[in-house]
Amino acid sequence: SDNNASSGGAGDPWILGTTDTVTALDPAGSYDLGSSTLEYNLYQTLVTVPPNSTEIVGDAAKSCTYDDPTTLTCKLNPGEKFSNGDALTSADVKYSFERAIKIQDANGAAIYLLGSITDTAKDGTVTLNKGAIETPDDTTVVFHLDHPDTTFQYVLTYPGAAAIVDQDVFPADKKLADDQIIGSGPYKLSQYKAGDQAVLELNPNYTGPNTGKAPQVFVKYYTEPSALKLAVQNGEVDVAWRSLAPTDVASLKKDSNVTVATGKGSEIRYWVWNLNSGIGKQAAVRQAAAQIIDRDAIAKDAYDGTVDPLNSIVPPGYGGANEAFKTQYGAPNPAKAKQILKAAGISTPVNITVGWTPTHYGPSTEDEANEFQRQLESSGLFKVTLKSTEWEQYQTIYKQGAYDMWILGWFPDYPDGDDYLSPFMVDGGFFANGYHNAQVNKLVAQEQGTDDQAKRQQIFGQLQDIAAKDVPFIPTWVGQNTAVYGKGMSGVESTLDPSFIFRFWLVTKSG
C-alpha cells in the first residue's frame, strides 16, 4: 500500500558527489547526463531499462507493445499519482510530449529523438504530427509513427525525450523553474541550488517497482575532479561518480577507506576518416591505419588502464555487439599494413592531418592523439600532422574538411545497438564524413523496421563487419562506469552499467 512507501526508507541519508553539470530539471530543456541523473530518479517514463539489461520493462506503463511497426500502444498502471497527489493519466503523457516539442528548447532532446512522430519544416521548426498521439481512455496511450521504427520504444526510456510531467504544474509553452518541478519517480525534489546541491526525499505517492530505500539523497556538485577526490577521501561525500581523473582513480585504489567499483561502460572514442579528402577517399589508406592501431597501448599509456580497448563501434554489453575490427585485422601489424598500401600502389609515407580537441573530452585526449601519431609514424608508413582546435570551432570545421581524420566521443541516447550504427554509418553520419554505402542504408531500414530482436542483432553484426572492411572510422576505446564509495555503502555496484543511469533507489548507507 501507499503507507509502506511513505514510511519506507532503510538506513541513513547518503551523499553523491559529481562534477557533472545540470542544464535543466524540466525534461523539456535537457539532453545531458548531469540533468538526466536527477530526472531518472524524480520522474517516470512509460518504460525503462533494468540494470545491466537492454530489455525494456514497464515503468509508468505496465507495457508498451507494437501492434505493427508503426503503432505502439502503452497501457498505464492504474491509480498512478505524482508526488503532489495529482492523478497521472494518459492526458499527462500526451501533454508531456506536446509541450516538449512546442517549447523546442535548443538544449532539449525532443527535437532530436522524436523524429518518428514529428515533422521538421525548412526553417527548422519541429511540430508534432497530427494524430501522432491518441488517448482512447485514461490508461491508454497510442503512438502512430510516420515510418516503421522499433527504436522508438527505446527513446521512451529516456527522460530528456519522454519523462512524464504533471499538466497542472508545468506550463505549456515555457520551462518550469528547476526548484518547482514535480514528478512521479521514487524520489521527489525538496531543495535545489544550481551548481551547489540537490536534496531528494522519498516520494510518498510512488507505487512503482523501484521504491527507494534511503530516506534522503543529497547530490553535491564540484567543479574540479581533484576536489571530488578529496571529498570522497575525507567522507564529505559517500559516493563519487563522474568524473575523477585516471590518475586519481589509480591512487584511490590504494586507499583502504574507500572502494573503487567499475561496471561496463558505454562512452566510446573513435577516429573518423574524411572520405571527401584525396587521402581518406582511398580505402587502402584507411585499412592500413586500422591494421596498425594498438588499442591496448592507447588504453594503458594514455588512460592509465581506466578504459578498455574497443574492437567495434558497438560496445560489449549491447545485443549484437561483436569485435569486427579484431576479426578483420587481428593483432597490430605494420608489415601487413605495408602490404595493403603496396597492393593498392600507394607510395609511402602517406601524409595525413589529424584533428583533436583539447578540453571537451578531458586532458587525456592529448595523450591519445600523441600515442596515435606515434603508432602511425613508427610504422614508417605515415607522416602525421596533429592539429588541435577548441570544441566550439572544432565541431564546425571537421565537417568542412579541415582534417583527413579526427577524434570524437559518443554517449548513447538509448540502450540499443542502433544508436551506435545509424548515426555513424548512414549517409556520412552526423559527422558528415562523406561515407555512403547503399547496403548499409538498406540494412538500417530493415533493423529499424522489425521488432524481431534476433534478426536486428544479426543485422547489427553485418553492419559492424561492413564498418571494419570499409573503415569510415576506427574505434579505439570504451570507458568504464566507475564510482568510488566510502564505508557503510551498499548497492553502488548494482547500478554501474552501460546505461549510465545512477539508480538512487538501489543504494543504501548504514552505520
Question: In which residue ranges do the predicted regions lie?
Answer:
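N-terminal lobe/hinge region of extracytoplasmic solute-binding protein
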Residues: 17-68, 98, 182-183
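A structural "hinge/loop" feature
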Residues: 18-39, 60-62, 86, 150-162, ...
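Surface-exposed binding/hinge segments that line
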Residues: 65, 73-75, 94, 109-165
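Alpha-helical secondary-structure segments
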Residues: 88-98, 138-144, 185-186, 214-216, ...
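Ligand-site clamp/hinge motif
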Residues: 175, 181, 204-250
